[in-house]
């Protein structure tokens, strides 16, 4: 099994490289790529950690050597948010970066499972899909927007608020990966009893948690460490699925289009990537209304990505 990280010298990428070196199964190959010349050094640095994961680093304009033979590709390349920016402000720069990298994936490892971390995920996943489609290699079972951080934050905040064991707290998060499109299904959390006045503030905190980090870092970055852990968890789940285990994660994929062309919901992962898209289950009145309210934003985000490629 080979996992490639594109954008491995960045704030998310370096932390992700460390976590994957520690957490991937023994015998996995880990390829680290970034345009920055420091990248082979990042690979040497993490290669000194004593685990049976083989690491190689690549830098320069062309990610092809890192992508050759890859089963899983994680894309975290791009610019990060700064105070006053929202994820859509990143679009102008990151859209072109994702397009260029996915064009290389389409040629070098078209059958790989691709996890998009680069924001705005609602839009960059649509860009990736259209690039792969133009190349004639699009398989919707193998393209994912990594929304796992919304799940991690939900689990953390719910466990803190309700005094639950965080390792046993599970919160499905549906929709997209920015602002109002992030919808934690708090009504489905086991062992949590909610007062009416708790739901909306907690939902808003989860939706705006990225901004909480950006502001707290005072211009010094965005959520890189927690995002890296989220991406590592998702990568491990993908690798388990590809190895024949049954794993369920919430992720942003192309499904039946009931709500939007791309939509985050629980997905059973397996040998072909998406094995089954699971139902979102019963919603509270608050959640049903929030779902309906988010859809125009989500549709517009997706359309932006489609138009970026198709004009």
Swiss-Prot record:
Transmembrane segments: none
Protein source organism: Haemophilus influenzae (strain PittEE)
Superkingdom assignment: Bacteria
Name of this chain's protein: Malate dehydrogenase
Quaternary data: Homodimer.
The enzyme's E.C. designation: 1.1.1.37
Reaction(s) the record says it catalyses: (S)-malate + NAD(+) = oxaloacetate + NADH + H(+)
Family: Belongs to the LDH/MDH superfamily. MDH type 1 family.
One biological process term in Gene Ontology: tricarboxylic acid cycle
An annotated GO cellular component: cytoplasm
Active site: residue positions: 177
């Amino acid at each position: 099994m080979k996992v490639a990280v594109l954008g491995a010298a960045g704030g998310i990428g370096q932390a992700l490289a460390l976590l994957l070196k520690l957490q991937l199964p023994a015998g996995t190959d880990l390829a680290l790529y970034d345009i920055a010349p420091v990248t082979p050094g990042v690979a040497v640095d993490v290669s000194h950690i004593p685990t049976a994961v083989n690491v190689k680093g690549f830098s320069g304009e062309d990610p092809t050597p890192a992508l050759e033979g890859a089963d899983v590709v994680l894309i975290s390349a791009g610019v990060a948010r700064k105070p006053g920016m929202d994820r859509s402000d990143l679009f102008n720069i990151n859209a072109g970066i994702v397009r260029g990298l996915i064009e290389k994936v389409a040629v070098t490892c078209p059958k790989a499972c691709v996890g998009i971390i680069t924001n705005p995920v609602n839009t960059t996943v649509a860009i990736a899909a259209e690039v792969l489609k133009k190349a004639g290699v699009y398989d919707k079972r193998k393209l994912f927007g990594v929304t796992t951080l919304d799940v991690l934050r939900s689990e953390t905040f719910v466990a803190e608020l309700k005094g639950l064991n965080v390792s046993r707290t599970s919160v499905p998060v549906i929709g997209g990966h920015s602002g109002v499109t992030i919808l934690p299904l708090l009504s489905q959390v086991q062992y949590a009893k909610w007062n009416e006045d708790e739901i909306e503030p907690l939902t808003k905190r989860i939706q705006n948690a990225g901004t909480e980090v950006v502001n707290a870092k005072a211009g010094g970055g965005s959520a890189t460490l927690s995002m890296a852990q989220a991406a590592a968890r998702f990568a491990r789940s993908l690798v388990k699925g590809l190895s024949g285990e049954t794993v369920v994660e919430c992720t942003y994929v192309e499904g039946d289009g009931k709500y939007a062309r791309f939509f985050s919901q629980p997905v059973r992962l397996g040998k072909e990537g998406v094995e089954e898209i699971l139902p979102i289950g019963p919603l509270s009145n608050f959640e049903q209304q929030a779902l309906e309210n988010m859809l125009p934003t989500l549709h517009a985000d997706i359309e932006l990505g489609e138009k970026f490629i198709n004009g």
